[in-house]
């Protein structure tokens, strides 16, 4: 079999000159994924970094060469160029299911589509588990590795960098924490049942359109919660048949979970009750950005401008009620236009489309209520992803245009000739003794500050040659200039404070906010900001309001300056990263990942110590002080949780944990008692 696979790979070798690379569309476990053209058809080209181990490349190629299924991404060929390896794979124009569900723009979809995606994912996994002679385990099933094609109607599994042969009982941890089965990160031996657990979390995600454990950033905290039996909250009014299947698949004991073949059979029966999965979803996935427009011109999903209304939406407005085949097609998604130009005109119609039925329950009730039979567009949620990720969703057109306006304005200001800096120097000032200088004027100071008149305090280089005036002037002019700038700045600051205090004391004085030394520069810069950040117009004839308005304008100017500096710093950083050697870049990224894992372990350890101390105090025992471990003594990120915490009299350490094998609900999480092998 290995020889046959090697021969197939040799036959599938592609000359790199036949490939025309286009924009990057994402990244996988070991490399970048680019859109490309090969033999007059669109393909996805996965580039493996030079530092990637050859065995990882060979593993993915070997596994893909064995796979041929409509719900699994196909491998067309392999190529190499400049010490980099490229895999030519099937292109999924719809992007990942994760971006579809949780991206900036959230296209609408029906319950029929959700059930169809879950069924197709189950069929692809069942195919892997049933392969001969060596079945395969994916080990990293999550929406990021599920791609949409055919306008959202078809789903395909990708990223086989974690696939393993089922013939070997695997013990190394792979996958993401929120979708990872407890036996995987626990360190126990696991089988294909870990994919079934991950599939159940994906099913919950497409039903709720929420990210599991979204509010928890620490991966080890998520693993600890899953180990203790916590699961995502059950969906109210969810069909019992779907709920029973979902809860059976995420059971703690792997042997209690059904097989993927059984899941496929159940899903085939479920999808019969929901028609409409063959309806195309009108959206386009371009450069990690989803663009949705209906044929009648209405936008099928709310853009970023509705993010401010997020607090007004309750779970009731974002969930669905199962429908029968008779009425599943009746409730089509229709959302009014929400473009920037028509936002004001359509406020009433838009509000009527998204008004929740139980407003205000988002923060008070942990459960998600499903009271509508369709997916409405959901405003963008607050993202936890790093803004330094070069594969994040691109900025909106308005933000890009605003940034270009700022840059162009700064360039014009930099090119504008500035007034020449001049110094008025007393003719015989440097020839006078200190006593003569002090007696020359009753108002003169000993430092000679009154002898200098600075007409401009901007940091402009002094280029005027004053050597012809006096031999000592040229030597001391730079120092005098710097002191003069400092004095002038302090005087201006004191004068401005005194002036503002006088205005506050006399409320009858009108202050014109535009009468400032910036000649309207701050006003024009403030108008570049987003509407929610722009200064509110002041109250007429109110001195305090005028001062607040002026302060806001100053802060807006500072904000734009800082934001622009951040942009240039990020651009400079990106250029340095591109110029950096790939091996060095990978080493630095690996170091950053290890540092983050170290911080996560330290945080988890401190949390467990606090819980242990609280339990000891509650039981009337005085906890023994434990020396704080050295960071290097912390457990490896992939090791299972410390057993001296896990086996504390059979009870959980988290508040509200379950003892004695009973089930309870704590803070909206379904708690399942952990399983301990005899």
From Swiss-Prot:
Polar residues compositional bias, start-end: 353-364
PROSITE patterns reported for this sequence: PROTEIN_KINASE_ATP (PS00107), PROTEIN_KINASE_DOM (PS50011), PROTEIN_KINASE_ST (PS00108)
Ranges for region Disordered: 296-322, 339-365, 431-455, 616-647
Residues that coordinate or bind ATP: 25-33, 46
SUPFAM superfamilies for the chain: Protein kinase-like (PK-like)
Gene3D superfamilies cross-referenced by the UniProt entry: Phosphorylase Kinase, domain 1, Transferase(Phosphotransferase) domain 1
EC id: 2.7.11.25
Active site: 140 (proton acceptor)
Residue ranges, compositional bias (Low complexity): 313-322, 339-352
Gene Ontology biological process terms from the UniProt entry: apoptotic process; cellular response to lipopolysaccharide; compound eye development; defense response to Gram-negative bacterium; defense response to virus; dorsal closure; immune response; innate immune response
GO MF assignments: ATP binding; JUN kinase kinase kinase activity; MAP kinase kinase kinase activity; metal ion binding; protein serine kinase activity; protein serine/threonine kinase activity; ubiquitin protein ligase binding
Any Pfam family: PK_Tyr_Ser-Thr
Top EC class of this enzyme: transferase
Keyword Transferase in annotation: yes
Record has Chaperone as a keyword: no
Keywords: ATP-binding, Immunity, Innate immunity, Kinase, Magnesium, Metal-binding, Nucleotide-binding, Serine/threonine-protein kinase, Transferase
PANTHER family: MITOGEN-ACTIVATED PROTEIN KINASE KINASE KINASE 7
Function field: Component of a protein kinase signal transduction cascade. Mediator of TGF-beta signal transduction. Responsible for activation of the JNK MAPK pathway (basket, bsk and hemipterous, hep) in response to LPS. Component of the NF-kappa-B pathway; relish-mediated JNK inhibition involves proteasomal degradation of Tak1; certain targets of Relish that are induced during immune responses may facilitate destruction of Tak1 and switch off the JNK cascade. Participates in diverse roles such as control of cell shape and regulation of apoptosis.
Protein name: Mitogen-activated protein kinase kinase kinase 7
Organism: Drosophila melanogaster (Fruit fly)
């Amino acid at each position: 079999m290995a020889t046959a696979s090697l021969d197939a790979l040799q036959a599938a070798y592609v000359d790199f000159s036949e490939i025309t690379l286009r924009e990057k569309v994402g990244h996988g476990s070991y490399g970048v994924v680019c859109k490309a053209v090969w033999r007059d058809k669109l393909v996805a080209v996965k580039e493996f970094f030079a530092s990637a181990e050859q065995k990882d490349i060979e593993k993915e190629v070997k596994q893909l060469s064995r796979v041929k299924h409509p719900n699994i991404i196909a491998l067309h060929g392999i190529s190499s160029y400049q010490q980099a390896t490229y895999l030519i794979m099937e292109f999924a124009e719809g992007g990942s299911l994760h971006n579809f569900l949780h991206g900036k723009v959230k296209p609408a979809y029906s319950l029929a589509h959700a059930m169809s995606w879950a069924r197709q994912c189950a069929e692809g996994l069942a195919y892997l588990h049933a392969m001969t002679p060596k079945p395969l385990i994916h080990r990293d099933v999550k929406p990021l590795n599920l791609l949409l094609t055919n306008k959202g109607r078809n789903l395909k599994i990708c990223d086989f960098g974690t696939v393993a042969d089922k013939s070997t009982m695997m013990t190394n941890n792979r996958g993401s924490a929120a979708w990872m089965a407890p036996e995987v990160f626990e360190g126990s031996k696991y089988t294909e049942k870990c994919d079934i657990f991950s599939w159940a979390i994906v099913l919950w995600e497409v039903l709720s359109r929420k990210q599991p454990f979204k509010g928890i950033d620490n991966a080890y905290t998520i693993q600890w919660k899953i180990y203790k039996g916590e699961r995502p909250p059950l969906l109210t009014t969810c069909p019992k048949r779907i709920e029973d299947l979902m809860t059976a698949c995420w059971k703690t004991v792997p042997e209690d979970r059904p097989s993927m073949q059984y899941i496929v059979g159940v899903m085939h029966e479920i999808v019969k009750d929901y028609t409409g999965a063959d309806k195309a979803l009108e959206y386009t996935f371009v450069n990690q950005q989803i663009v949705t427009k209906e044929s009648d011109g209405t936008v099928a999903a709310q853009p970023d401008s509705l993010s401010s209304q997020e607090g007004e939406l309750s779970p009731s407005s974002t969930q669905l009620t199962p429908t029968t085949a008779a009425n599943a097609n009746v409730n089509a998604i229709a959302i009014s236009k929400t473009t920037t130009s028509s936002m004001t005109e359509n406020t009433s119609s838009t509000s009527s489309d998204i008004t929740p039925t139980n407003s205000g329950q988002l923060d008070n009730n942990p459960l998600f209520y499903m009271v509508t039979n369709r997916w409405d567009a959901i405003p963008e949620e607050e993202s936890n992803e790093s803004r330094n990720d070069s594969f994040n969703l691109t900025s909106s057109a308005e933000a890009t245009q605003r940034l270009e306006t700022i840059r162009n304005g700064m360039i014009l200001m930099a090119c504008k000739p500035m007034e020449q800096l001049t110094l008025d120097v007393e003719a015989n000032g440097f020839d006078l003794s200190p006593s003569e200088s002090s007696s020359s004027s009753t108002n003169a100071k000993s430092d000679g500050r009154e002898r200098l008149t600075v007409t401009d305090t901007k940091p402009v280089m002094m280029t005027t040659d004053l050597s012809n005036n006096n031999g000592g002037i040229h030597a001391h002019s730079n120092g005098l200039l710097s002191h003069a700038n400092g004095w002038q700045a302090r005087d201006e600051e004191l004068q401005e404070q005194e002036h503002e205090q006088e205005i506050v004391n006399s409320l009858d004085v009108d202050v014109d906010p535009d009468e400032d030394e910036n000649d309207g520069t701050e006003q024009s810069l403030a108008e570049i900001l987003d509407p929610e950040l722009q200064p509110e117009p002041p109250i007429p004839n109110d001195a305090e309001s005028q001062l607040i308005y002026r302060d806001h304008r100053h802060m807006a100017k500072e904000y734009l300056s800082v934001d622009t500096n951040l942009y240039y710093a990020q651009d400079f950083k990106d250029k340095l990263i591109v110029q950096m050697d790939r091996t060095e870049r990978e080493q630095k990224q690996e170091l950053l990942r290890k540092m983050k894992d170290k911080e996560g372990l330290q945080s988890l350890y401190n949390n467990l110590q606090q819980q242990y101390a609280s339990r000891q105090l509650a039981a009337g025992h005085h906890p023994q002080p434990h020396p704080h471990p050295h960071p290097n003594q912390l457990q490896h990120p992939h090791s299972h949780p410390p057993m001296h915490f896990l086996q504390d009299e059979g009870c959980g350490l988290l508040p509200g944990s379950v003892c004695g094998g009973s089930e309870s609900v704590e803070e909206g999480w379904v708690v399942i008692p952990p399983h301990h092998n005899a």
